Amino acid sequence: MADTDHYITAGIIYYCQEKYHQHVQNLAREGLKKYSNDPVLQFFKIYGMLMEDRVQDAIRRLEPIKDDPTVVLCSTMALIYAHKRSERVDREAVADLENKLKETRKSAGPKALYYAGMFLWLMGRTDKAREYIDRMLKISNRSREGLVLRGWLDLSSEKESTVNKSIRYFEEGIQDNKDIFALIGKAQYFMAHQNYSGALDVINQIIVNYPPFLPALTLKMRLFLAQQDWDQTLETAQRILLKDGANIDAFQILTIHSVTREGSTEKALNYLRELINALDAAEPRNPMLHLHKILPISSLCGRNQPILKQVSVVIGRIFQTAPHAEVATALANNFILQGNVTEAAGWYATAMKLDGNHLEGLTGVIQCQILQGQLEEAEQQLDFLHEIQESIGGTKELCYIQALLASRQGKEEQIITELLKKAVELHYAAVRGLPLGVEYFEKLNPTFLINIVQEYLVLCPKQPKAPGEPLSPLLKQALSILTPVVSVAPALTEPLYYTAQIKYLAGNLEGAQGSLQRCIEVDTACADFHLLMAQIHYAQGKFAECSVSLETGVSHNFKVRERPLYHLIRARVLRKTGELQEAIKTLKMTMSLQEMKRGALKKSTWGSLNSSDKVSIYLELAELLRLNGEQHEATKIIQDAINEFGGTPEEIRIVVANADMAVAKGDVEMALNVLRDIAPNQPYYTEVKQKMAQIYLNNRKDKKLYIGCYRELCEQQPGPHTSVLLGDALMNIQEPEKALEVYNEALHKNPQDASLANRIGQALIKTHQYKKAVNYYEAAQKISGQDFLCCDLAELLIKLKQYSKAEAVLKQALAHEPVSDLTSMVTDAKCLGLLGTTYQNYKKEESADILNKALELQQRILKRVPMEQPEMAPAQKQATSEICVQLAEHYVDQRNYEQAANYYKEAMVYSQDSKVKLQLSRLYLMMGDLDSCENHCSALLENHSFKEEAAMMMADVMFRKQDYTKSIELFDQILEENPDNFAVLSKLIDLLRRSGNLSKAPMFFEKALANSSRTTLEPGYNYCKGLYCWYLGQPNDGLKYFNKARKDSEWGQNAISNMVQICLNPDNEIVGGEVFEAPDEADGLLGEKRESEMLGVRTAEKLLKEFHPRTLNGRNQLALLQNHCLMATKDKANVETALSAFTEMATSEKDNVCAILAVAQAYMILRQTPRARNQLKRLSKVPWSLADAEDLEKSWLLLADVYIKLGKYDIATELLKRCLLYNKSCYKAYEYLGFIMENEQSYKDAAANYRLAWDYSNQSNPAVGFRLAFNYLKDKKYVDAIDICHKVLKAHPTYPKIEREILAKAQTSLKP
């Protein structure tokens, strides 16, 4: 039986629902080939004919099957329906059939009841169908197919509670994954509840089990569209066309995509023709299906003439086949869009003749009368229509034409805006809750919304909002009307153009430019786009770009030069470029144009001149004449403007311009007198008071009168808006406490205003009331529910280091179902980014996952932004770049440099931020990729903001490449410009030491001293001097200078750290080293030296009490130094305590060089050399970096010491050469090399190395002098040996050992 063939029955029922009557017949015929004479298939084949109005044919074919037990009820119902649709109704036959139906129903079986219920459901009689199916379920012991149909009946209900019950029937009725009809029902239930993933799973089950079942792919295509995933929607459409090259739904979707997303008229026309051909081929007798498939395209294409003409031809053809009022009205609507009001009026009249109660036809007639200026006739018709509508309620069309008529009759603004507002509410009520799809697009009707926006713009300010000026609520309303349209149809130029115009008037120039740029991309030839772009460029101060836009507009349409607006913009540009004469000439010529004459103004249409622009031309000319010294002529033009516009809302602008001219002449009092005459009930009163306030503040420097203007404004026009203006004014003059009081009063008047709540939060932060700010944000967020307040609160909590609270706030904001609207996605991405920041300080191990989620979401946003909200693109690219930087920084902390570099590179794809380039350069330096670092630094040297840091990094690169001259030159260039840049000088001193050129340092100190007489008092200068003395082997002088810097917030921490190191190791010995350990010190320090060292430890401990780190790195440094103090005591217990602390540090941070070195030093002091060696071997494999340079050098020297003690001179030599590679002044390395050569009895080489050690230690270490003199003695250079002995004894008279063992012998050897 066919009813067990899920493929055929589900397909037939699907096409019945979609009203694809020919498809139903075709599928039934296909089934009859397999199941010949099947009554169910025969019935559905006849049903398809009946729906095509082939009534007599259907009656004739129903007669043979009307008594079949399976289809007896549905066939009888179909016959009744067919007879009633006949031209001549056979009432006797109908009565007989109705009696038969009553009798048959009493004894009908489950199958008959099932198909009767199915027929009633398909005919739209759901409640009656429910009676039949409930009875069927009762007598069939709840058959599965009955349960499924019962689920469909509930799913078709308009009551949400009933729809929610449907899933229960589907779940109970689904026998297996082969019941396609049940699975489609379940998928549709999921779609109705926006559970798209659940719906997709079900649809995929059908596709897997029944690959040829085309409706499943169609549903999948609609499902992707509901998710706004156009890529997958188009891909699925193409899959459908591969299986069915004339698929109606696929071509409809492709046409809609071409119109709404691509803006390609050519592609849209091609797909539209394919759609028409598919309809003609697949559904030739289905005119109303043709209409309903074409109408969404007609609704979406706006005023695209080629598409409208094609649609008109199709609808005209449909009318010939089906002359219904609905078709006539659709054709009339199409002619309205084409601007052919006369033709439209004729078709609306035709619709009224066909159906006298056709309301859309009547409203269309009235609209045409208004557009043709027949206002009295329109008013009479509207009164009649209004009486009819009172019984059934208002419609959006009625509200709109009422507003249109009120506007043309010059009625009050409030009446017009109330009607427009109601029209918009009724319009969007029809689409609310609908998923994105064909029905949504048809009901969205962008052109209707544009008509409403045009009426709003007539009432809106005509000049862009000045900074600080309140935004007109009408502009807000107009923008909110268009936002959903631009979001789903970003290639429709008319909504984009008006969106750009609104944003321009609202002062959002970047947003306006983004929207308009999209318009130009879609249609480069529209001159109006270029004119508005010129206005935007002018407002941005981009005068060259403004001129280009004007000329581009002219190149596309030469008639642009006949528009006064073109000349106004051009004159303004000429004024800015100083060409006053040319600008005056341009505007004088403009005054003679037709549009500038009285009565020439038009209603707001594309590119038309409004009264505001006309006034602007007068005022611009007056200002130009004044600037050109033609004061009398300027006054005359102002007077002409007053004569023409006196008594209009624009008069106040002329008065304000008059006041500006007075201020420019220095007559402030006259300007104020002119402005004082403006009464509170006049237009622009708020702007006038703000102008007065600015004069008081800027010209009179009187803050009291400045605030007085805003207080008067609040008294005359009390409300939240004026209170906010007063609060902002108080903030402007640095009185946040008073501003807080005003903001709070305003919030009481308007508790739902989230922006006001944000102002209060910012004011609390400005007054350092952080706790109050947190409490306030928390309370405000609960009241308003605004997510951006969550972000503000989280940012504040992060600043206050209250990370757990920040996490809780952000998690709460993110605790919702996945969102698809762009605004919510942007908010979620921001919340995820902030959560990642929180975790970087709080739960480092989780931060990467969260930031990757944020990045993934940002990338989805970036795919949609260019089409939906192009003005957001720069900000969203920047946000994406910042998340990449956060991830890079995370991986730098983890020392995963390759991954970090990848994220920095990705960040630079989204934003060419030099700061990111600098961070990447720094990373390349850490990685040892010197060439990449050099390439990036070279580019950064051209950027003044980053030149200094780039030069320092480049110097580091040059140093590592052993190009010391170039390295020093780079630092020298910076210091030439700023000799007192001590941050650079400190790095240069280190570089000079490492390159063996420390002797050049004094000249830089001299330059700094010459720059200012106060240089010696500068902490930075003293720090640099301390560093120089320390490196020079003068620890006491170093301490003295560091001491002068230790109280400074910038230099103090490093100064104290260096002082502690000097106190603990004044002679710069190798801690833990044994090679140069004196025999008498083998068992510990004794006597005076011991006491001296303990004094150093105590001094270091005292200094550390002043060490107050603010960062985690600073706290780690403090812990390290404290334990170094313990280790310096050489007491076993203390050393073991220090070792434990060092080990813990090294374990928590596996690559912490200074901690690992300290562990090795502690082991050496405890005589656990093998363990020390293991740690030092680890460090020998660490790549050199400037940050770890000192500790790596110490580790290599200590490891060399170990190997020397073991007699492994080759390995030790390699380590020592590595030290000298990165520090030419490392005298300890030379000392060790001298020791190795001496032990190998190569006294000449030993003397050469000791000589370098002696020179680089500034000839201050007597032990090194002793070894040098000894090797000179051995090499028989007696004079040199004697010379060194004298130098040592002069500096250290208490060093008799050298006199006894070397000097005497050398002198004896010289004697003949």
UniProtKB/Swiss-Prot annotation:
It holds the Pfam family ARM_TT21_4th. InterPro entries: ARM_TT21_2nd, ARM_TT21_4th, ARM_TT21_5th, ARM_TT21_C, ARM_TT21_N, TPR-like_helical_dom_sf, TPR_rpt, TTC21A/TTC21B. One of its GO terms (biological process) is intraciliary retrograde transport. TPR repeats lie at residues 4-38, 110-143, 147-180, 182-213, 214-247, 325-358, 493-526, 528-560, 564-597, 615-648, 720-753, 755-787, 789-820, 829-861, 881-914, 916-947, 948-981, 983-1015, 1019-1052, 1193-1226, 1228-1260, 1262-1295. The gene is ttc21b. Residues 365-392 form a coiled coil. Component of the IFT complex A (IFT-A). Keywords: Coiled coil, Repeat, TPR repeat. Belongs to the TTC21 family. One of its GO terms (cellular component) is intraciliary transport particle A. SUPFAM superfamilies: TPR-like. This is Tetratricopeptide repeat protein 21B. Component of the IFT complex A (IFT-A), a complex required for retrograde ciliary transport and entry into cilia of G protein-coupled receptors (GPCRs). Negatively modulates the SHH signal transduction.
